[in-house]
Structures are given as structure tokens and as C-alpha cells.
UniProtKB/Swiss-Prot annotation:
Record: residues binding 3-methyl-2-oxobutanoate: D45, S46, D84, K114
Pathway assignment: Cofactor biosynthesis; (R)-pantothenate biosynthesis; (R)-pantoate from 3-methyl-2-oxobutanoate: step 1/2
Entries under NCBIfam families matching the protein: panB, PRK00311.1
CDD domains documented for this protein: KPHMT-like (cd06557)
Chief place of localization: cytoplasm
Organism, as annotated: Carboxydothermus hydrogenoformans (strain ATCC BAA-161 / DSM 6008 / Z-2901)
UniProt name for this protein: 3-methyl-2-oxobutanoate hydroxymethyltransferase
Keyword presence, Cytoplasm: yes
Cofactor: Mg(2+)
Domain of life: Bacteria
Amino acid sequence: MDRVTVSSLKEMKEAGQKIAMITAYDYPSALFAEEAGAEVLLVGDSLGMVVLGYDSTVPVTMEEMLHHVKAVVRGSKRSMVVADMPFMSYQASYTDALYNAGRFLKEGGAQAVKLEGGGEIAELVAKLVTAGIPVMGHIGLTPQSVNALGGYKVQGKDLKTAQKLLDDAKALADAGAFAIVLECVPAALAAKITESIPIPTIGIGSGVNCDGQVLVYHDVLGMYPRMLPKFVKRYADLSSLIKEAIRQYVQEVKEQQFPEEKHSFTMAPEILERIY
């Protein structure tokens, strides 16, 4: 079965078909997400927070990302796998960016990379695309720049920042990006950006009129009993199910209810008798 491609996503936009993207961080999450029909699996640097326990995405390294990208690729056959470029893997120089992005495709097996930033990285995006590396953009609330942005806030609510986001989207599209994530952008502005560029927009907290949507795997499944951003919809409460299952296991071990006879293996009694 052929994987979803850059062309596939553009055709979906042109046909008015919505794109479903979700994060995946390992073999089982990739397997489940693909079987559920997601066209795109994003190996997000959000793994730093939901998998590795960091306070933000900033500490995530290339080696950590590559480890998880490889697992997601092994767990999928049809979905496009997009690898997040972690903080400082592309900001220092074009050489760094090309080398690291190339590793995601060559070593990791990903089909594309995602970079945070607007017009200021357009030239870099163009160079990566020229080198044969498909690039997904990411504007609005960019988590790697959360310190510079003053926290996790909606972006583009005033005239100056709204115009900049539109200009950024156009610059990335002109540079050859095949899609752009719009994070925490007012819905009306996201709709205007979506209709102003020829490539798909993938929204997260940016309204229903984007060409697609993305959410974090763990948030969708309710795997952490934590406060969620306004834009997250929790479709399950796995944290309760997981804790209850493990609680029952622990209790049965302590009360010698597990393992039962059906969980154990047997041997001939005469063999046991001959052991001394």
C-alpha cells in the first residue's frame, strides 16, 4: 500500500476533504493511528513532555527524535510520517538544518520534516525543498519559542501580528512548504490564511475552517489526568482504565490470585522427583 504523499494532501485540499493528523511516538501509537484512518502521523517534539517527562519541548535532542521516528515508521505503512525538527537542530546554520533534516529521511525513514517559524525561515525552507526534503511549516504559537512569546498564548489577535501571520504563511508557501500548521490562531484569521494559500493548513486551536486538524495522541486518549488546553477534545479516559488495570494486577499478585493454573506451565511429576 502506497503512503500518503505531498500530492495526496494537496489534492485533498482542492477536493475539500479534511486531513486528519495526530501525533505518534512509538510503534503501537503509529499502528493504532493508521488503522483509525489518520493520513498524517507527526512525531512531534511534544514527546519531550508526554513521553520523556521534560517541562517543555526545548530539551529534546536529535537522537531522541530519531529513536521515536524510527519506531513510528516501523508501525505504519500508509500514513505520511512527519518528523519535528527539535530546538536548535536547524536554527544555527543551513548546514546543520540540511544534515539533521536529511537524517530524519535517510536514517529515520520519515517522509517529511516540520519546522517552526515564518518568513524568517523561508529561505531555509526553500533550500531544504531544493535538496529534496519535503517541509511542513508551523506558525502561530510555536512551542520552541514559548519563552520569547511570553508563554502559551493565542497569536494574531491584533492587526500587526495578524498581518504577520498571513505574510508568514504566504512566504512559507512561496518557499515550497507543502503544508503549514496553524497553532492557537483566531478561527477567522486561520480561515483567511487557509483560503489565501494553495497548500493545506493543519489547525490546532485554530478553528474548523483549516484544511485539517492535529492533536496530541495522549490528549485525545485522556492518558494524563491534567488540565487540557481549550482546543483539546478528550475522546477517551484511558488514564482511569490503565490505573485500574494495574491496581487489579498489583492486588492479585499480593493476594496470590495471579498467576492462576491456566497461566502456568506443567512438567511430568517423575522428572521433578529425580531432581536433587
